[in-house]
C-alpha cells in the first residue's frame, strides 16, 4: 500500500516494521560479534514479528531467506547495518569529545544508544518518534531492568508535524551545540518534508553542531532489488513491500542542501564504509542498486 503524507504505524507495520528489521540486523550482528547492542534482540522479540525474531536469533540463514547473489536481502541488510552502526557510534563519540552534550536521534525507532553508549557526563539524549514507538521501547527496556547511560527525553511527535516546538518544550537548548542523527530516515520522508527537516535542524542548531545522515537513493534498480527480496520473504510469512514505503519524485541531495544552509558536509560512500569494516561490497556497475548511497557528516558554521 502506498504511503500517504499523514500515515501512522506501529513497529510491526509499514515504516515501523523497518525499524524492527534494522533492530533484527543489529541483533544478528551482535550475535556475530560485529557490534555490541544487547537490547536489539529483546526489542525484536517483544515486537513479535516471527520472521525478524528468527533472523535476530540466528534461526534463519541467508540461504533460507535471500536470493543468492542479490543486491539486497537480510544478510546484505545486516552487513549495511553493521557498518552504519559503527559509523554512527563513532560519530557520537567524536561529538562528545568535541564537547557536545545535546544529542537528538530523529525517528529513533528501536535505537538503544541512550542505554548502550558511554555518554560523557552532562549529556542529554532526545529521542523523537511517534508516540506508540517510544512508549513500546521504553516499556520493553524497563522490563529488562536497564538504566540509560544519560538522561533520556522522549519527544513523542511525528517528524512531519511541529516537532521543533515539542523538542524545545522537552528542554532542548537552541543556544548550545547538538549532535543530530538521521539514520535510515530521509528516504522515508516526502521530498519537501526532507528539506523542511534539514531547515528545522539548521534553525535549531548553534554553531559547532554536528549532523550524521544516511542518504538512500530511491532509484528504480534499488526498488527492484527491494521487491525481489520481499517476494522470497513472503514465503516465510513476512509481507512488507519495502519499495512502497518511500515517496517518489525528485529530491534535493542532502549534502548539497546542507552546504547551502551553512553546514560543511563530508560524504562517505556506502562501499567505503563496507570496505572499512571488511564487509562485502555492493556492485559499482552503472545503475546498480544502492550504488549512489552514501553517509554524510556535517558541522554547522553559520558565520562561515
Swiss-Prot record:
Belongs to the UPF0677 family. The keyword Methyltransferase applies. The keyword Acyltransferase does not apply. S-adenosyl-L-methionine binds at residues 129, 158-159. Exhibits S-adenosyl-L-methionine-dependent methyltransferase activity. One of its GO terms (biological process) is methylation. The lineage of its organism: Bacteria, Bacillati, Actinomycetota, Actinomycetes, Mycobacteriales. NCBIfam families: mthyl_TIGR00027. It comes from the Bacteria. GO terms for molecular function: methyltransferase activity. Keywords: Methyltransferase, S-adenosyl-L-methionine, Transferase. It comes from Mycobacterium avium (strain 104). This is Putative S-adenosyl-L-methionine-dependent methyltransferase MAV_4236.
Amino acid at each position: 500500500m502506498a504511503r500517504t503524507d499523514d500515515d501512522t504505524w506501529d513497529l510491526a507495520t509499514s515504516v515501523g516494521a523497518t525499524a524492527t528489521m534494522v533492530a533484527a540486523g543489529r541483533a544478528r550482528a551482535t550475535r556475530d560479534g560485529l557490534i555490541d547492542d544487547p537490547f536489539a534482540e529483546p526489542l525484536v522479540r517483544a515486537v513479535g514479528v516471527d520472521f525478524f525474531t528468527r533472523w535476530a536469533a540466528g534461526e534463519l540463514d541467508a540461504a533460507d531467506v535471500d536470493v543468492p547473489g542479490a543486491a539486497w536481502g537480510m544478510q546484505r541488510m545486516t552487513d549495511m547495518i553493521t557498518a552504519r552502526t559503527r559509523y554512527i557510534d563513532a560519530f557520537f563519540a567524536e561529538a562528545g569529545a568535541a564537547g557536545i552534550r545535546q544529542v537528538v536521534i530523529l525517528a529513533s525507532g528501536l535505537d538503544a544508544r541512550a542505554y548502550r553508549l558511554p555518554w560523557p557526563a552532562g549529556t542529554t539524549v532526545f529521542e523523537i518518534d511517534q508516540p506508540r514507538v517510544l512508549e513500546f521501547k521504553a516499556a520493553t527496556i524497563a522490563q529488562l531492568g536497564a538504566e540509560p547511560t544519560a538522561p533520556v527525553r522522549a519527544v513523542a511527535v511525528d517528524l512531519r508535524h511541529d516537532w521543533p516546538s515539542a523538542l524545545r518544550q522537552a528542554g532542548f537548548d537552541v543556544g548550545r551545540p547538538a549532535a543530530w542523527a538521521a539514520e535510515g530516515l530521509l528516504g522515508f520522508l516526502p521530498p519537501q518534508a526532507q528539506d523542511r527537516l534539514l531547515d528545522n535542524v539548521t534553525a535549531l542548531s548553534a554553531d559547532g553542531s554536528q549532523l550524521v545522515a544516511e542518504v538512500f537513493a530511491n532509484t528504480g534498480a534499488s526498488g527492484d532489488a527491494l521487491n525481489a527480496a520481499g517476494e522470497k520473504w513472503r514465503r516465510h510469512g513476512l509481507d512488507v513491500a519495502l519499495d512502497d514505503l518511500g515517496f517518489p519524485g525528485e529530491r534535493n541531495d542532502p549534502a548539497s542542501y546542507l552546504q547551502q544552509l551553512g553546514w560543511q558536509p563530508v560524504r562517505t560512500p556506502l562501499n567505503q564504509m563496507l570496505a572499512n569494516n571488511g564487509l562485502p561490497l555492493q556492485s559499482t556497475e552503472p545503475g546498480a542498486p544502492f550504488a549512489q548511497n552514501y553517509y554524510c557528516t556535517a558541522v554547522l558554521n553559520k558565520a562561515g
